[in-house]
A protein has these predicted regions:
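Glycine-rich phosphate-binding loop of nucleotide-binding enzymes
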Residues: 12-80, 224, 228, 244-248, ...
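Conserved P-loop NTPase motor module
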Residues: 2-15, 135, 167, 190, ...
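The start of beta-strands in P-loop NTPase/AAA+ ATPase cores
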Residues: 61, 173, 214-215
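Active-site regions of enzymes building and remodeling cell-envelope glycoconjugates
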Residues: 73-84, 258-263, 272-281, 287-291
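Active-site flanking residues adjacent to catalytic metal/cofactor-binding acidic residues
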Residues: 65, 177, 218-219
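Helical/strand "switch-coupling" subdomains that flank nucleotide/phosphate-binding cores, especially
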Residues: 75-163, 171-174
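Conserved P-loop NTPase motor cores
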Residues: 32, 36-45, 181-277
């Protein structure tokens, strides 16, 4: 009965006061949504379960990048999404594609040179621009061939999509992008980066917002946080447009991510820099232990 009462109180809590995530020594513990959120903890410590509760209690429309098919909502197979990459700035497109394919910095710059004057609307157009790009040295010939091979390896997955990704952003419900059907790790990373960049563009066109108006939940976030500065840029800049990114990860993110985030630790681990005996909310350099509800 007590558990039911706590859940009812948590659900009724006003968004302005934050979302209830647990009970501490001084009562209910609320997670503010004026910053991004990191949910971290070892495997099978309840990270996904907590993320689902925060989504529900916030009442905000949410887009979930679901790596393993664990979230509920309006589900959409990632293979059905259509990305209009022509709407991306060419430098951003080169970075997103390059990081998704795990290219090094010289290869990303080469990719940018190949596409900067080309008309691009699909990944197939990116491959064609590369193929048409004139090179002068043996090293450039080899670099060009290597990039095309990697791109063709994953491009066909993104050529069959029929549902514009913008339709996902316009729903007022929880939209779950199911990445579990994608076979390759690179496909999942690239799809995640495309969604993040597309959502950033979508919200930027709507203008600055002083209040949170949408959630982006990134499951297995450690897989994209390792992909370079452009991910951090999109992460940092998105907050001013009302987007709150919730990173669900079993690794403690880098310090520059933590500075912009509240951290909920579902279970302590010796590799984490924060010291706590149980689950905890870390904000403003203070660790508040709690029992998650």
């Amino acid at each position: 009965m007590w558990d039911v009462f706590l859940l009812l109180v948590a659900t009724m809590a006003a968004l302005d006061d934050g979302v209830v995530v647990g009970v501490g020594p001084r009562g209910l513990v609320r997670l503010p949504l004026d910053r991004h959120v990191v949910i971290t903890g070892p495997t099978r410590s309840g990270k996904t379960r907590l993320a689902k509760r925060i989504i529900k209690r916030s009442g905000l429309p949410a887009v979930v990048l679901d790596w393993h098919g664990e979230y509920s909502g309006v589900r959409l197979d990632a293979r059905l999404l259509k990305f209009d990459v022509g709407k991306f700035d060419k430098k951003l497109l080169a970075e997103v594609v390059g990081l998704g394919l795990n290219l090094n910095e010289p290869s990303i710059y080469f990719l940018y040179r190949a596409i900067k004057s080309a008309k691009i609307s699909t990944l197939g157009d990116v491959a064609k621009a590369l193929d048409d790009f004139l090179v002068a040295t043996r090293s450039e010939v080899e670099m060009k061939a290597a990039i095309i091979r990697r791109l063709e390896y994953v491009a066909d997955v993104f050529e069959r999509g029929k549902v514009p990704v913008e339709a996902v952003f316009k729903t007022r419900r929880v939209a779950v992008v199911d990445l579990s059907k994608l076979r390759l790790y690179e496909e999942k990373v690239l799809a995640s980066l495309f969604v993040l960049a597309s959502l950033y563009n979508h919200l930027a066109n709507r203008g600055v917002s002083k209040r949170p108006n949408a959630l982006l939940v990134v499951d297995e976030a450690q897989n994209i946080l390792k992909r370079g500065d452009v991910v951090r840029y999109l992460f940092f800049e998105s907050a001013k447009y009302g987007l709150r990114v919730m990173l669900v990860t079993n690794e403690m993110p880098p310090g520059d991510i933590l500075v912009h985030s509240y951290v909920v630790m579902t279970r302590p681990h010796f590799t984490y820099t924060f010291s706590a005996k149980r689950s905890a909310l870390i904000r403003d350099n203070k660790v508040e232990e709690l029992w998650i509800i």
